[in-house]
Amino acid sequence: MSDTNHSTLKVSDFSFELPDELIARYPQEQRSASRLLSVKANENSIEHKHFKNIVDEINAGDLLVFNDTRVIPARLLGEKVSGGKVEVLVERLLDDHRVLAHVRANRAPKAGAELLLEGHVKITMLARHDALFELKFEHDETVLELLEQYGHMPLPPYIDRPDESSDKERYQTVYNREPGAVAAPTAGLHFDDEILQQLRDKGVNSAYVTLHVGAGTFQPVRVEDINDHVMHSEYAKVSAETCNAIKQTKASGGRVIAVGTTSVRSLESAAQASTNESIEPFFDDTNIFIYPGYEFKVVDSMITNFHLPESTLIMLVSAFVGRDLIMKAYNEAIKERYRFFSYGDAMLLQR
């Protein structure tokens, strides 16, 4: 591949101009009605398809690895009891009553400050940990119960509209089961029950990881030399059952196909932490940063959405099929007016 020297890659090498109207503000009426851009590095090819074609692209004996995290309604609006508006975005659940959260206010609350959110939810500020605040929910109900009742879905900043009741269903995969994410693993949004059944009928296998996507996924890279970037941490879980499914798939000549960059990062984190040449169960925080030059240890193909310019995720997909091919694919997608970002269209990357 005629890619730029990896050691000299700059953030600006991953920039592209996106017309504002190509940012998808709403999902397609039907999940699987999205388009699919198929990119094959070994053939240096780009093909335009529909997501329904995904069944034809995946073979019996292949393993799809899904992230089963559930997005929580993590955004709460209200005021400090002492006065002044405040917005809380829960980043991580610590236990049934404590969280780490981002807090937006004219003046940051100090330890002991009390907040009243959505007119009902009483919160005490316990401590500050760098950019995050440790908050205690002063209720008998659990944090999750309170968020389900009063919280707003934490739509990404570029969707640029208030959340609506339909987002509670659509900004969520159909196979979610582990609450804790504050952003959806968006490649999975295209799968509906019908496509999942067609894949099962074909003999395609499934496995699950859990990575609770944090708000840090939307943080821009603030350094020009990508070697200087420090990734945010997220909790990932790769079970023994999933590791065994991967080993069996590889042994029988099938492909491990990661659904979404969060599944990629979970699997590659588990492989990196392994004490042998294989993959071992992983239950830990990961801040893995995958960019060109990275040697993939587990993932053979991936399904992903289109990512923000200069983001760590466009760097990850560039690491997989090459920066030049990714930038060419993105430019073609813009020309063909694909829908971008969380509620947008999908890519299938093979090599």
From Swiss-Prot:
Its EC number is 2.4.99.17. InterPro entries: QueA, QueA_dom1, QueA_dom2, QueA_sf. One of its GO terms (biological process) is queuosine biosynthetic process. Pathway: tRNA modification; tRNA-queuosine biosynthesis. The keyword Iron does not apply. It catalyses: 7-aminomethyl-7-carbaguanosine(34) in tRNA + S-adenosyl-L-methionine = epoxyqueuosine(34) in tRNA + adenine + L-methionine + 2 H(+). Keywords: Cytoplasm, Queuosine biosynthesis, S-adenosyl-L-methionine, Transferase. It is an enzyme of class 2 (transferase). Signal peptide: none annotated. One of its GO terms (molecular function) is S-adenosylmethionine:tRNA ribosyltransferase-isomerase activity. GO terms for cellular component: cytoplasm. It is found in: Cytoplasm. Belongs to the QueA family. Monomer. Transfers and isomerizes the ribose moiety from AdoMet to the 7-aminomethyl group of 7-deazaguanine (preQ1-tRNA) to give epoxyqueuosine (oQ-tRNA). This is S-adenosylmethionine:tRNA ribosyltransferase-isomerase. It comes from Idiomarina loihiensis (strain ATCC BAA-735 / DSM 15497 / L2-TR). The lineage of its organism: Bacteria, Pseudomonadati, Pseudomonadota, Gammaproteobacteria, Alteromonadales.
